[in-house]
C-alpha cells in the first residue's frame, strides 16, 4: 500500500462520513415530520376531508417507512462493470447484507409508489369538482389497487439479490485502489446488490423505477390544467368562493408536491452517470440516495403548511392561545399608551 492509496482511501472515508451525517440528519427529520402529519390526519381531519385524507395518510406512511429504511441502510453506490453494487453504512449491517438489500428495495419501491399516489391526488381533486366525494372505503381500495405494481416490484427486485462474497470479489477487481477487502481499513464492510443490471428481474425493476414517471407526470399536468380552468370560472362548475379557494389551496399544495420529484430526477441522473461509468467520484457515489432521501422529508412539510386544519392544529400546539393572549394584550396596551401619551 503506497502513500497515494492511503490518501485516496482517507479522502473516501471522510466523504463517506460527511454523507452519513447528512443521512442521520435528513432521515430522522423525515420521520418526525411524517409522524406529526400522521397524528394530525388521525385527530384533526374535518369530516369533509375524510376521504381525501386517506391519500395524505398513504403519502405519509410511505414517506415515514422510506425515511426509516433509509436511516437503517445509509447506502452508497459503487458500480463495478454492469454489476449494481451498494455499500451500506447503516445499522442494517449488524443483521445481514440481505436485510440491507431488502431496505434498498423497500426505499426504491416507496419512492416509486409515491408517484402513483400523487397522480391519484390530482385525479381526485378534479373528480370532486362536480361529483360527490367518494367514501373512505373506496379511496382505501384505490390505494391498495395502485400499490399492487409496487408490491410486485419488491418481489421481483428482491428475488435477484446476488451473493455477497461474489459481489465483494467484483468490487475489489474493479476498484483495487480502495482495498475494500481489508478489514483493518474498512472493518466489516457490507455489500449487496445485483450481479448484472441486464438480468430480467433487475432490468424490469429499473424500467419500473424510471419509465412510468413520464406518463404519470403527463396525466398530472393535464388534470392540473383542467382543474384550474374549472376553478377560474372557465368551466361550467359553480361553487362558493370559499369552496373555490379551498380547492385552489389544495391544488397549490399538490403542484408544489409535483415539483419535489426534481430530487428524484437529479438523483437518477447521478445514478445513471455512475452506472455507465461517466463519473466515478466518491461524492457522486454518495449523492443519489442522500438526494432521494430529501423527498420524503420535504413532502409532509407541504401538507402541514397548505392543508389549513393541519396548519391550524400545529400552530395551536406550538403557540397555544393561552400563551398568545397575554402577549397580544400587552402589545395592545403598549400601543394604546403610546397613542394617548401627551406630546412634549
Curated annotation (Swiss-Prot):
The chain crosses the membrane at residues 21-41, 54-74, 102-122, 142-162, 203-223, 259-279, 287-307. GO terms for cellular component: membrane. Pfam families: 7TM_GPCR_Srd. InterPro entries: 7TM_GPCR_serpentine_rcpt_Srd, GPCR_Rhodpsn_7TM, Nematode_rcpt-like_delta. It is found in: Membrane. Keywords: Membrane, Transmembrane, Transmembrane helix. Belongs to the nematode receptor-like protein srd family. This is Serpentine receptor class delta-3. It comes from Caenorhabditis elegans. The gene is srd-3.
Amino acid at each position: 500500500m503506497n502513500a497515494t492509496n492511503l490518501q485516496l482511501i482517507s479522502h473516501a472515508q471522510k466523504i463517506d462520513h460527511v454523507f452519513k451525517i447528512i443521512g442521520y440528519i435528513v432521515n430522522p427529520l423525515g420521520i418526525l415530520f411524517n409522524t406529526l402529519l400522521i397524528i394530525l390526519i388521525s385527530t384533526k381531519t374535518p369530516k369533509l376531508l375524510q376521504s381525501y385524507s386517506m391519500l395524505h395518510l398513504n403519502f405519509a406512511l410511505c414517506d415515514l417507512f422510506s425515511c426509516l429504511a433509509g436511516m437503517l441502510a445509509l447506502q452508497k453506490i459503487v458500480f463495478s462493470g454492469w454489476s449494481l453494487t451498494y455499500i451500506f453504512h447503516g445499522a442494517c449491517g449488524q443483521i445481514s447484507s440481505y436485510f440491507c438489500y431488502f431496505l434498498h428495495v423497500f426505499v426504491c419501491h416507496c419512492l416509486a409508489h409515491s408517484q402513483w399516489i400523487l397522480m391519484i391526488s390530482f385525479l381526485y381533486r378534479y373528480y370532486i369538482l362536480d361529483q360527490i366525494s367518494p367514501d373512505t372505503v373506496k379511496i382505501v381500495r384505490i390505494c391498495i389497487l395502485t400499490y399492487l405494481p409496487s408490491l410486485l416490484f419488491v418481489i421481483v427486485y428482491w428475488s435477484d439479490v446476488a451473493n455477497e462474497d461474489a459481489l465483494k470479489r467484483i468490487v475489489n477487481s474493479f476498484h483495487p485502489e480502495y482495498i475494500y477487502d481489508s478489514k483493518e481499513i474498512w472493518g466489516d464492510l457490507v455489500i449487496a446488490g445485483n450481479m448484472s443490471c441486464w438480468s430480467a428481474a433487475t432490468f424490469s425493476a429499473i424500467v419500473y423505477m424510471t419509465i412510468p414517471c413520464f406518463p404519470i407526470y403527463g396525466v398530472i399536468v393535464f388534470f392540473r390544467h383542467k382543474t384550474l380552468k374549472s376553478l377560474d370560472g372557465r368551466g361550467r362548475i359553480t361553487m362558493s368562493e370559499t369552496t373555490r379557494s379551498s380547492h385552489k389551496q389544495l391544488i397549490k399544495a399538490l403542484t408544489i408536491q409535483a415539483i419535489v420529484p426534481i430530487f428524484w430526477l437529479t438523483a437518477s441522473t447521478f445514478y445513471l452517470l455512475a452506472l455507465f461509468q461517466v463519473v466515478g467520484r466518491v461524492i457522486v457515489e454518495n449523492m443519489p440516495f442522500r438526494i432521494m432521501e430529501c423527498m420524503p422529508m420535504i413532502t409532509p412539510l407541504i401538507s402541514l403548511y397548505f392543508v389549513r386544519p393541519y396548519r391550524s392544529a400545529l400552530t395551536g400546539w406550538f403557540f397555544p392561545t393561552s400563551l398568545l393572549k397575554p402577549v397580544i394584550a400587552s402589545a395592545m396596551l403598549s400601543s394604546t399608551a403610546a397613542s394617548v401619551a401627551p406630546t412634549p
